């Protein structure tokens, strides 16, 4: 007789898991069959809400090893010495697709890393591109609505996509990247990752710098052409997920080098554009890459739901020595991500094994749905108190910085949406430009209103006249004389 007994969720042995309890062989099923009721009820509740963005994803465990001394820039403990290793979990994803969507579509890829440090978890929640479509979080719900399905037809709507982009010229840099060869990575292993936003590092003396993160793939950058990507999407929609899993399973561990760009605090006041604008990159001639360490992925998840689906990341998950910047998009994400996790996974999502800090969590938060640890036990549950409860550590406060201005709804004061998009276009080879234009033309052909196409062409033209002319020719449309 097997010692591996099937049990109910409350631990009692199950006598029959093949036949419902009925009144005779042909009689009705009995409500007293509590095992049947529990089994069906749990099945009805197996799904949690799908992520509103980045729903389709793959993940892996690994480690980060420091390869260069950066202690003069940050006091973060996990970066404190060369050779130090920190365990991590990463989740890659597409942005717009649903859980069952194809991997090889034209879409930015999420690149979210959770470091399990001795000072708590630290998340870098970025993409495989260094910029984004918008720079103020107030526009994010509208932007994502255009990327998702039309509420009337339940179909993707190219008119909505290009209408929004053409009315949001700050998107041009990211649109150019998306429509280029880089828009469809060959695999998750063959793409770079970026923190995208500007962050602040502070050292033990309280001295700060602005930084940007760059993860450079050691596998080399490889992309898919449109026809190959479409073929794979039809034959194996989980191609990227499968490739990552198989590579790690076969011992072919993917790795990335982490670099930072470092900007002195005072340069933010004089740089030629706002360094907190996530639609722009910092020139590497001005702020060269400095190596920090190496990330290696060497272990697959044991259970997709428990680890990849329930993993939660937020740019607000910070550790001492690393702070945020005034980037408006980043500031909105500080709220939105944690709030999304509270809705999707629950108020105590950070206590789940995949999200739980490796050091002791010590605070006065109590109760809430699915509180499954000791809930603080019998310890003091308020602060201040006279019973030896946990105390704040003033030395770990976020670094102070001066602010000024009038409280108002204010746009960014830099309106050059075209220089960097044009620079990127001119950096491309002739073949790369041809494919870029073909991708844009094919994506814009279904747009219903000609005025939307003309408006977008004008943006391309302002970035580079050749860029605009070639798109216009592909669509059979004129260039505005005043462009």
From Swiss-Prot:
Entry keyword set: Cytoplasm, Heme, Hydrogen peroxide, Iron, Metal-binding, Oxidoreductase, Peroxidase
Active site: 54, 127
Traits of the deletion mutant: Insertion mutant shows increased sensitivity to H(2)0(2), reduced catalase expression and an absence of induced protection of the cell.
Transmembrane parts of this sequence: none
Cofactor: heme
Cell compartments where the protein resides: Cytoplasm
A single BP term in Gene Ontology: response to hydrogen peroxide
Pfam families (UniProt xref): Catalase, Catalase-rel
Polar residues bias spans: 1-23
Gene3D superfamilies named in the record: Catalase core domain (2.40.180.10)
Region Disordered, residue ranges: 1-27, 372-397
Cross-referenced PROSITE patterns: CATALASE_1, CATALASE_2, CATALASE_3
Primary enzyme class: oxidoreductase
Family the entry assigns: Belongs to the catalase family.
Function: Decomposes hydrogen peroxide into water and oxygen; serves to protect cells from the toxic effects of hydrogen peroxide.
Protein name listed in UniProt: Vegetative catalase
Taxon lineage: Bacteria, Bacillati, Bacillota, Bacilli, Bacillales
